[in-house]
Amino acid sequence: MKEQWMQKTVVVWFLAMICCLLWGSAFPCIKIGYKMFHIASADASSQLLFAGCRFFLAGVLVLLLGTSGNFKLKKTEIPMAMTLAVFQTILQYVFFYMGLAHATGVKSSIINGANSFLVIIIASLIFHQEKLTGPKILGCIIGFAGVVLVNLGGAGLDMSFHWNGEFFILISTVSAACSSAFIKKFSTKANPVLLSGWQFMMGGTVLIIMGKLMGGKFQFEGIAPMFLLLYMACISAVAYTLWSLLLKYNPPSR
């Protein structure tokens, strides 16, 4: 019954829109958070520390509120959670923050916008979770062209490609796309909500350690920054959990 309900077009569309709205609200919150926590735009180490705290808290929320108290991983599920932590949190955000300091906003948005299309390609050609048909290829081309046009906005786009800038953003995007395919694969064997919570905690812990070792730090005054951090954790917890459930019952291209 739950599977049929989660496969209804209106349900898929509605939940996917919620995910997109939550992820969209994260970007302005991140900028506000940097101001509240006194983090410079080029301070990648402090940004990693900040992201680690956010994701660790998100993992705690998912496990406490989304697993009905049964948050223990089986031995066979530990490698799954670790794999998701590597691709969905660690690689994605380490390379994103590192690359963002050396890439233009336009190029970063274009490369990051290719995520949805990379998910289809990776799920089809590498994980063989669905067939890559002509309409899907055409849809990817048209969709990516739309992303490019929207992000150009009259600004010039040079063809330069820096290994520590655009290339890092590309690695981040590919990593995020791979994580969607892994979620689809693992959700047939384990509870995606449980995996989501643990991967957030594992990935968040690694980001916190990396940020601290690189000299990251932040400071804040008052209680407002803590409420913002809690909201950002809720964004990740709700959006990624819903996305995991959608991928469990639907093909990635849908």
Go through each PLM region and give its residues.
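Transmembrane alpha-helices of multi-pass small-molecule transport proteins
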Residues: 30, 35-90, 118-122, 175-179, ...
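Loop-to-transmembrane alpha-helix entry segments
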Residues: 76, 109-112, 128-149, 159-165, ...
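Hydrophobic transmembrane alpha-helices of multi-pass small-molecule transport proteins
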Residues: 62, 121-122, 134-154, 207
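Specific transmembrane alpha-helical segments of multi-pass solute transporters/efflux pumps
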Residues: 26, 63, 67-112, 149, ...
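Specific alpha-helical transmembrane segments that line the substrate/conduction pathway
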Residues: 49-52, 56-60, 88, 92-93, ...
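Membrane-interface helix caps of multi-pass small-molecule transporters
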Residues: 32, 64-67, 94, 98, ...
